[in-house]
Amino acid sequence: MTELVLQTTNYAFGGSVVARDQNGRPIFVQGALPGETVRAALTVDKDRFAHAYVTEVLEPAPERSVPHCPHYGHCGGCHYQHVVYEEQLRAKRLVVQDQLQRIGGLKDVEILPVLGSPEAWEYAQEAAFSPTAGGDLGYWFPRQREVMPIEACSITRPRIMTL
């Protein structure tokens, strides 16, 4: 698997951050924050873009935090647990703004700040579970083609997890 050292720039849709290779090709990096230097492994390598995930953070951003959930990075349920909560809200606003401007062509749209939950954990009132091969419920592993059974989720309300 090809690894690159990358300088990240801004948030992108789906929880990734944009970096560019030496030719200016965008690389969408999972697990990074804007302004970081990371070592990343390519998972998709196309002529016009690539996808990668962080294997090592060489220079962390000040907004980086330790993920709360032991499944983070393996489970596909969360994108931003490696980011302090206030920055998570900012990232979501910036992604919506970018999508409306760059894809939608709407330049003068005011995007209000995202309203956060009073609780940084166990706030989600819905979850998109899939059945595992054994009949349990879980989340899809990123970069793998199987569902990971989850007994506890750091962002989902505990009552939902009793299903």
Regions found by a protein language model. Give the residues of each.
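Accessory RNA-recognition modules of RNA-modification enzymes
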Residues: 1-163
